[in-house]
Amino acid sequence: MPVFQSKTFRRATTASSSLGERIGETYRARLPKHPFLLFGFPFVMIIVAGSFALTPAAALRYERYDRKVQQLSQEEAMNLGLRGPDGEEGIKRNPRRRIIGDEREEYYRLMAKDLDNWEQKRVQRFKGEPDGKL
């Protein structure tokens, strides 16, 4: 007979040991024997359940964004430059508004410019603003 018994020692369950301690003890004892079943499988299930739970939240996010951002037709976009702050037409004109007929026309107009002969001009400063000259 060996000096030490092969049976592992397990302390007696007392009234002071709670249910959580007993469950944890059995979990730790069985984890080396079945690592995937007790650790990997619950982890994978939590990830899958989380993806199902977060799908409606992501859909809600994109639906709110779609309600906020609306696609304008080309005619509405052109009219944006002619409206005032309250929507009255003809009150203020946007100086940067240009009507571009066709992309090809714009391309050829830009290609016709002479980009080799240019002269650097200083921008006129406001009164009291330093001009940056030393």
Swiss-Prot record:
Any one biological process term the GO annotation gives: mitochondrial cytochrome c oxidase assembly
Domain of life: Eukaryota
Membrane topology: Single-pass membrane protein
Transit peptide location on this chain: 1-12
Role this protein plays: Required for the assembly of the mitochondrial respiratory chain complex IV (CIV), also known as cytochrome c oxidase. May participate in merging the COX1 and COX2 assembly lines.
Biological classification of the source: Eukaryota, Fungi, Dikarya, Ascomycota, Pezizomycotina
Transmembrane stretches, start-end: 35-55
This protein's name: Cytochrome c oxidase assembly protein cox16, mitochondrial
Record's GO cellular component terms: mitochondrial inner membrane
Compartment(s) where it occurs, according to its Swiss-Prot or TrEMBL record: Mitochondrion inner membrane
Record family assignment: Belongs to the COX16 family.
Any one Pfam family match given in the protein's UniProt record, by short name: COX16
Organism: Aspergillus oryzae (strain ATCC 42149 / RIB 40) (Yellow koji mold)
Keyword terms of this UniProt record: Membrane, Mitochondrion, Mitochondrion inner membrane, Transit peptide, Transmembrane, Transmembrane helix
